[in-house]
Amino acid sequence: MALPNAPTGELKAVRDPEVEEREVDILIVGGGMAACGTAFEVHKWLGDDQSVLLVDKAAMERSGAVAQGLSAINTYVGENAPEDYVRMVRNDLMGLVREDLIFDLGCHVDDSVHLFEEWGLPIWKKTDDGKNLDGKKGQKLGTLKSGAQPVRTGKWQIMINGESYKRIVAEAGKLAIGEDNILERCFIVELLLDANEENQIAGAVGFSVRENKVFIIKCKTMMVACGGAVNIYQPRSVGEGKGRAWYPVWNAGSTYTMCMKVGAELTMMENRFTPARFKDGYGPVGAWFLLFKAKTLNGLGEPYAGSDAAKAELEKYAPYGTAAITPTCLRNHLMLFEMKEGRGPIIMDTVTALAELGKTMDKKELKHLESEAWEDFLDMTCGQANLWCATDTEPEKKNSEIMPTEPYLLGSHSGCCGLWTSGPDYDWVPEEYKIKARNGKVYKQMTTVQGLFTAGDGVGGSGHKFSSGSHAEGRIAAKQMVRYAKDFADFTPTLAQSKEELVDLVYKPVRTFLDNYEYSTHVDFNPNYIKPEGMMYRLMKATHEYGAGTATYYMTTSKSLEIIMD
């Protein structure tokens, strides 16, 4: 909704918007990988008399964390066992996980990866003599499903040419669910409980970001998958770099906030993810560590990770710190340890890595390798490639600095915060991990609110899903929601609020602005309201200084937390 000071050409907001009311059996809120998985899967199970609607605040082709593309799929079990996948996730998140959710996902995630390849996603392949083939060359070796071997950069990761990854997945979802069942450019802001049935989801309300319109949507069951939370903490990129973050800036924490406000239980929200990335451009480091075999150095040029001091520090966190693979959070801890000891900054030794790989390659292969170093960024973080150009950085000639980012809240990467959801209804799953509906049945990924499901970043205690796992969780949720809607076919959602009350709720910021913007000489500064940007800066300042942001090396105290809560 545009305000009167918006650039010429935008539609100005009005006091009384148009209202559109809808009612469906199944409502999907979100347009990222999880929601695309749900959109693709739902019609396989949907009855002829059942209806579905997907609502996205953006456009599905470039919505969610994968919008800019990826250069790898980080979760593909393949020849490994789901039990080993559970062990890996448990170790990386230092035991704070739901093994039932992780195991169940590990049994299903590969099917989504096979679908991605079937839809046209180029996946790198390994030849019999150990050569790596990317793009169309890799496709000639066949599919993963038919037995072709992927190029592994680790035990679980596979390389892709993924600039258009999200577009490929979104197209499949849109074709499956049907364009008539998709509502884009609609920002859902509140979930609504049923007026008669206690603790039962009944609908949602939101507004169009293109028109002066409010949407009120009733439903029997709903999935909310709107990503994690970014810009809670002040990013390292400020000034003209404002808006550059690692996770997508449009992940506003809606998944957690909206579900929490209707009573859904949260879990592990104290678990924040702080990835190490190339400084300022937030470029990914995974391919450099795993594919190019690069090492990190401290400011003295020492490979600190294997030093006696580092080993002694890791032993404090045994058994996780002494495991064969050091957990992500402890690798970051070692970086901070070096910096606090005065041995910073931390450097990615790209020069040595490419030189070592080049010893076994001819000139053509080496040139291709150098191109892949750039494409790794162009596939998923264009800003980092721009930064390398602006600073005359050639990775084969000049090393780059890496740095832990500001903290993010998420549940699909190397973090595990989110909503408490039901595990699968298997005998070995503890009863306290199963959430039963009022009919006594268990519906996997249902939250503590009846009929409210989630996936991807929304599922707490189950990290390391990444893009493929989020898509698979969306597909699992689709089947469970259809089952729920069929089991409660006689349920008629009834909203406690009137249409007028919901419009007042959604358009209160607009009306407050229209009533008061002429009071001051500049619309950004007014004693009667605060604009979103001003609210964001206040939140960032508080978390940055008191809430364990980068300003305090990610540390806080009980007194600091009391200040921020005030």
Predicted regions and their residues:
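Extreme N-terminal leader/targeting segments of oxidoreductases
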Residues: 1-26, 44-45, 49
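Core beta-strand elements of the Rossmann-like FAD/NAD(P) dinucleotide-binding domain
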Residues: 21-24, 211-221
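N-terminal Rossmann-like FAD-binding beta1-loop-alpha1 element of flavoenzymes
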Residues: 26-53
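Glycine-rich FAD pyrophosphate-binding loop
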Residues: 45-68
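Glycine-rich active-site loop/strand segments that organize a redox cofactor
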Residues: 73-106
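Mobile, glycine/GP-rich and aromatic-enriched active-site lid/loop segments adjacent to catalytic centers
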Residues: 119-202, 269-463, 542-566
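Glycine-rich loop(s) and the adjacent beta-strand/alpha-helix scaffold that form part
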Residues: 224-284, 467-480
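Long, amphipathic alpha-helical stalk/connector segments used for oligomerization, subunit docking
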Residues: 487-565
